[in-house]
Amino acid sequence: MPGNVSTKMDEKLKFVSRYLDGEKISALCQEFGISRVTCHKIIDRYKDSGLEAFTDRSRRPFRQANHLPFQVEQLIVKLKKEFPTWGAPKLRDRLHTHYPDIALPAKSTVHAVLDRHGLVKKKRGRHHPKLTGTNLSDLKEPNALWCVDYKGEFMLGNKQYCYPLTVTDYASRFLICCEGLESTREAQAFTVFEQLFKEYGLPGSIRSDNGVPFACANALYGLSSLSVWWLRLGIGIERIKPGNPQQNGRHERMHLTLKQATTKPPAKTLLQQQDKFEDFIYEYNYERPHQALDMKKPADLYMPSARKYEGLPDVSYPFHDKTVTVTNCGRICLDGKKIHFSTVFAGHDVGLRQVEDDVWLVSFMDYDMAYFDMESSRVQALENPFGPKVLGM
């Protein structure tokens, strides 16, 4: 069956669920890419043994970390339809009373299941805009989109490694920055970008790959402290798909030219190498014509952004019950409870809104991020508001 994320067992469970909802077999066969013979085998196995038929033959455990079993999720949905006015706490209690053998999910998990199935009534008057995420834009105006990357490390003459951080303007090809750094550590990148924002203003969006420090594999939605800072400044984030550097093709072509002109051979020291980068920047922007620009030079088209950098703007949450500052260790402190949220939001204000008894919604700026419940202190992420979830929580 198709799908490179879900296992075969997941696909069969989805197939059976939709069959039970009354969808036609022919349409399901076509969508799942299976024959009618295979289709009827799956249905017959279900009729003989129920969902356990798939569980028994699967090598996957019934319950995985951070993954609610399919059967439990379906029970929650079924209970909600039986008791449409009940919220997560009452449904959870019903689960505990009538299905005592089931590992009881947290209230926030129950609420997230209801939300995922469209069974949570949304309050009016609240709009949740979304970033383009991995939907890549093709913008024509200077500073609408910057492209960033590290031009792979290379060794200098003194055996020290150099990590060039490069930034280009997408529309004009203007090479805004090529800064030789000692590492890809976040602190150094912060310093470079703050200086760029002061000198050139703020872009509309920044496109990057999924590497450090632009993303963080273990953080909520793959965000990093750097990308959270960009969001606070009103800068959108775009990410190319993993293993698809051609999606940042203009930037990659510049890297080829940069490598040929400045690293063969490399300079002896980092300062001397930076001199080579500066010479290249001037030539690339002011002397070298570009065929894609009708033989114009990037400097002929580029101008600094009208959006000035003035530090982090204030953020407020008028539609929420509380505003709290995430601690340096990534916690939300509420009524004596310490909820581990994410360290990438350390020092930033988030909005909290109570949606059920003991269940709270966490929002960052205009983005709803997660639920947590006070009883278990467990956080349940919502659907990624920045696009397809490239990196897990």
Show the residue positions of the predicted features.
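Short, amphipathic alpha-helical "recognition" segments used to contact nucleic acids or chromatin
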Residues: 7-23, 73-82
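Basic, flexible linker segments flanking DNA-binding modules
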Residues: 51-147, 153, 224, 297-307
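Mobile-element integrase/transposase regions
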Residues: 70, 112-168, 172-175, 182, ...
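Acidic/histidine-rich, metal-coordinating catalytic segments
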Residues: 197-220, 241-243, 248, 294-298
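C-terminal, beta-rich DNA-binding module of retroviral/retroelements integrases
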Residues: 281, 285-393
